[in-house]
Amino acid sequence: LDPLMRVGPQADGHRKPRPTERRRGLFRRLGLPEEAERLYPFQLSGGMARRVLVSTALITDARLVIADEPTPGMSLDQALEALTMFREMADQGRGVVLITHDIDLAVAFADRVAVFYAGTTVETLPASDFQTGPQALRHPYTKALWRALPQNGFTPIPGFQPYAGSLPPGCLFAPRCPHRTPECEMAPPPARELRGGEVRCIHAT
């Protein structure tokens, strides 16, 4: 947000005529008080600022919205409302890319999920596979994430992600993988299609 502009005009953008009523409706849905439109960014809490930013994305007719961690600082109800609005955009045929560490929220609202490890996509899958359980997942890291969720036993993943400057030569997850073989450490595995998704693991079946 521009620190020198009030947040109402920022959310409206350069559209003419100004979509004031539409923006006020979005503010209400996101739990922002009416007077928020007259405030400057420094007068907002972190959660309020994120809700203003969400409204700037929703007020447009953009064909693609990329939302990077849009919900931290929001209450659960506010986060659910924001994600419901993104879901409505997707149902209208627009693209929404949600970047988040909150697996439960992502799985609840997404059509497909891409799992990253050390900056690389290790698996893409239908969100419903994550809800099914580890037998529907493909990559050992994705399965480890599933087991690390509180409702699935909160089992930690041993070890640490590699630093960007010291990546292993083969599979990035191999040093932490209980199923690794010497082949895993020879070269990065290519992405391949498997059971309606894509995976970077030579042993995935």
Say what each PLM segment does.
Residues 126-205:
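Short catalytic/signature loops enriched in Gly
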